[in-house]
Amino acid sequence: MGEWAFLGSLLDAVQLQSPLVGRLWLVIMLIFRILVLATVGGAVFEDEQEEFVCNTLQPGCRQTCYDRAFPVSHYRFWLFHILLLSAPPVLFVIYSMHQASKEAGGAQLAPPCARGRAEAPCSPCALRARRARRCYLLSVALRLLAELAFLGGQALLYGFRVDPHYACAGPPCPHTVDCFVSRPTEKTVFVVFYFAVGLLSALLSVAELGHLLWKGRQRAKLLPPPPPSPSLPSQRGDPDPFGPPAYAHRSPAGDSEGEGGSGHSKASLATVRQDLAI
């Protein structure tokens, strides 16, 4: 149970970035899959090979028939299913933690746009938020693909019913051998339940994917246009190409004023450069 608790804590961190539909998917994942499989599934399928009985004493025949009846154990198939479904959300959590650590380390070096104008479409905060939304959208899409792939695999491998009787023929069995499965009704109920949970999870993933795409379009419509690039106001008119050069009328007092104006222009250039760097 320690491994399940660790996986549950990682998945629980996803709800901070998830909408309501994503949180419903997380509840189904934690309760109806991880909890049920860890408590009930192990008890139902732990002795399936030991209780798989065939009416023959031929060495190796029972093991071969069991392998033909169940190419992959139900329990191990569902374990791999849960691990693969958990991979995209866990990777998104790792990405979010990495971005949070980078922001915490560079908070003092953040430009003014990131501190005072985070709603600007070109600000670093807006870019980071857009990048996080795209990563979450990708994780939901990968989760949906994994869900559909495993639902198809379960239907092809096992179907929806565990038969109590299995007729096995072929080497090393000398003839057609009758084999019997333990607790077939209980296993059938569990197989149908797990498939229904998978369908519900896939529907929630489709709904969440559609919700995220719709929210992205609405956000793009409401996004304000980027502000125009700032430019330095002209202090003087255009020089006369036929007039005397400006330095011909310079006076000592004008030189001192020019030095002050030069310092002011440098300060303005520094301010504009800082704004343009945002």
Swiss-Prot record:
InterPro entries the UniProt entry points to:
Connexin (IPR000500), Connexin_CCC (IPR019570), Connexin_CS (IPR017990), Connexin_N (IPR013092), Connexin_N_sf (IPR038359)
Q: Which UniProt keywords apply?
A: Cell junction, Cell membrane, Gap junction, Membrane, Transmembrane, Transmembrane helix
Which PROSITE patterns does the entry link to? CONNEXINS_2
What Gene Ontology terms describe where this protein resides (cellular component)?
Answer: cell surface; connexin complex; gap junction
Residues crossing the lipid bilayer are 25-45, 77-97, 137-157, 189-209
- What function does this protein fulfil? One gap junction consists of a cluster of closely packed pairs of transmembrane channels, the connexons, through which materials of low MW diffuse from one cell to a neighboring cell.
Quaternary organization: A connexon is composed of a hexamer of connexins.
What's the protein name? Answer: Gap junction delta-3 protein
**Native source species:** Mus musculus (Mouse)
User: What gene is this protein translated from?
Assistant: Gjd3
